Amino acid sequence: MSAIVDIVGREILDSRGNPTVECDVLLESGVMGRAAVPSGASTGSREAIELRDGDKSRYLGKGVLKAVGYINNEISEAVLGLDASEQAFLDRTLIELDGTENKSRLGANAMLAVSMAVARAAAEEAGLPLYRYFGGMAAVQMPVPMMNVINGGEHANNNLDLQELMIIPLGAPSFREALRYGAEVFHALKKILHDKGISTAVGDEGGFAPNVPGGHEAAIQMILEAIDKAGYVAGEQIALGLDCAASEFYKDGKYELSGEGLSLSAQEWTDMLATWVDKYPIISIEDGMAEGDWDGWKILTDRLGKNVQIVGDDLFVTNTKILKEGIDKGIANSILIKINQIGTLTETFAAIEMAKRAGYTAVISHRSGETEDSTIADIAVGTNAGQIKTGSLSRSDRMAKYNQLLRIEEDLGEVASYPGRSAFYNLR
């Protein structure tokens, strides 16, 4: 038995300079696990609640001392003495202790920090790398990265309404090479922007955040130019992905693309996306419709779902109840997995498993407010998810995940596999 003998929560800062929760869990053997939780900017309304202090005199009200206090007192009292290797029982204990549907009493940030730290301690106790602890001997598949090279929406202060324009190196032979493809395109894009006199400042997730004359299509065309200049073939070696984060520009039943001067119905917005899919090698569209516009989601899925990965993020918020409803109604064909949307590892793994059983893909994801914690890299490999979304090729909070994946691929050696296009098994 790996009994938990001490838990310490603390307030640290994330990549945006906002407070977040970190937790240390100490086991009887002397082994310790540490984990820190991320935070999002564009959030789904049905996400588990992130507990903030609301004290405007500290960190503009964004302090997390309440959540830390729950870890150091109430949660600590409930889990001391529990076996760290019994993750499902520990997570159930946390859920029952909170007692709310959306984790609003203790806070998903407090609960997740404990859940992750316990898993790290248990893996260390077992003498296993975290990905192997999660997935056993079957954990051999590296994820295809979705790399956010141009930021817009809530992640940048520019004229782009869409939140992320991504490159997806699905033609690479290995994860290491996929990362190289991405880095070389990133640097090619930087030079293109510089030569055009466009800002090369980066946004929250490390992608460039320029005002782009000509809007979204001009931005897509610059990415395609960068792919070509880096020596790769768009569509064959590197595909494109979009995160629309459409809830952020959905107003009164219309999709208000202010940067384009457009106000569109769900049908018109779908037509516009379909036009882009026809013109450009776009293989994935995330949150193409607002989270509450299920009719719009159905239109989008029916129109593009056979050829394009249609990912639900704000739509599903890593919640199995909502995901099941989407599966039953034929909404989307993929789920974005964000551990802090649901608040425990056990519930996270349940959402991944449900998606796979239904033929949906599961894309493991970071948040825009990140830390040096690299747990999601281990989750991506441990669950054989096949895809990961963890930002651009800059900012150490993003690179921490990529570098951990490099280490995992090295550790796996010859048994490591890189799925490439087959990671998109939801497409026909």
Swiss-Prot record:
Subcellular location as annotated: Cytoplasm; Secreted; Cell surface
Similarity-based family: Belongs to the enolase family.
Positions bound to (2R)-2-phosphoglycerate: Q163, K338, R367, S368, K389
Encoding gene per record: eno
Record's catalysed reaction(s): (2R)-2-phosphoglycerate = phosphoenolpyruvate + H2O
Active site (record annotation): E205, K338
Cofactor: Mg(2+)
Species whose genome carries this gene: Polaromonas naphthalenivorans (strain CJ2)
SUPFAM superfamilies assigned to the protein according to its UniProt record, in alphabetical order: Enolase C-terminal domain-like, Enolase N-terminal domain-like
UniProt keyword annotations, A-Z: Cytoplasm, Glycolysis, Lyase, Magnesium, Metal-binding, Secreted
SMART domains: Enolase_C, Enolase_N
GO terms, biological process: glycolytic process
Protein name: Enolase
InterPro entries in the cross-refs: Enolase (IPR000941), Enolase-like_C_sf (IPR036849), Enolase-like_N (IPR029017), Enolase_C (IPR020810), Enolase_CS (IPR020809), Enolase_N (IPR020811)
Tagged with keyword Metal-binding: yes
